């Protein structure tokens, strides 16, 4: 019986995530059932939220105390999970969009501007995760590719204040907004901050505690505050593996 339940759950999760998914058999069955029931309650809560908002936002898991503001400007792919206490404010020019199977961790906040100075918005690709207590300020456009994993306490600040004049307060001098881009398949360590204008290439690893601004080439290992390239991931072995995976030939 237990093996049947494990296999049934694996089939369902594999279909949802569109890849093979295997459960750790060391998880006690009672805990696994409890997790499934909790996720089902989150799914029901998401469906009820859709009805209240009179929106069809798909197959979304919502933990308690999720706050969706200006929800008509928020778009969800299938299988998105919003953990406890998440706040998302869709007020923006381009809206806030999540791909399939995105996870937003507990007490994270995503917003894009204010009534007097509308921000651009956020586009987060499929299979991304943003862990607990993170913040995305998308006054400028924030674009995150597919399969990006991010730790706790991640911050995006896609805006800079002008401060050249000293005769008026900084808050009244205006802002500049270049935006922030993280390409596909990146891993971002905890307590990393992205400043306006940051562009991180595909396959980069960002060390915990980094302060990221400027451009970084694909497959870089990036460390420090301010961040710098420590080395490239493109070793001879990695290039060979990539060539085999794509059916090519190593150079």
Residue ranges and their predicted role:
Residues 165, 171, 220-221, 235-238:
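Short, glycine/charged-enriched secondary-structure capping and boundary segments
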Residues 28, 168-169:
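Short, structural beta-strand-to-alpha-helix junction motif
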Residues 1-157, 183-184, 192, 202, ...:
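Domain-scale signature associated with acetyltransferase and cell-envelope carbohydrate enzymes
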Residues 199-223, 227:
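C-terminal/domain-terminus segments
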Residues 158-166:
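Short acidic/His/Gly/Ser-rich catalytic and metal-binding motifs that mark active-site loops
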